Amino acid sequence: MPELESMIEQKLIEQLVYGDSQWTYRKDLKTEADLWENFRYILEQNNKDRLDGEPLSDQEFEQVKNQLQFSSFYKAGEWLVGENGKVQVHVQRDTKRLHLVVMNHEHIAGGSSVYEIINQYSALNTDENSNMPARDRRFDVTLLINGLPMIHIELKNKQHSYMDGFRQIKKYIGEGKFTGIFSAVQ
């Protein structure tokens, strides 16, 4: 009898968090609002010095969110390359322009980087103007780096080809599921 995809999913998560792994499983992150809140917290923690200890206001965080709306995976990839090893967003606070570090390439596999795993994320249909039928989707496993979804994984058991997972991701792209905070997925 083929293994259930939910079991494969659980084994993957267990493998990623096993031992001295830096990955943390976040079963509490299920919606886009949860993900934005988590990203905001990590961004503020990693930039306390630049923020002078003052958290981002809602208006300032809207500036950040607007910068993270990528029109393509390529545009997201360009941003992720960063400048001088740092991936940044910029916030106007009164008369000051703040440069907040989202990722520091020197902190990969350590430093201030935060590695998290989510599963069964609810990708709700939000595009009422789409020609595609309205469908909510549930993503299998997504890997977050500093709160941003970076890697999306659709798992298949032995009854289904890995190409079925590939086609499923292509379908999600066509349905516009990789938008908002998910627009940085690579």
Predicted segment positions?
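An alpha-helical interface "stripe"
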Residues: M1-Q186
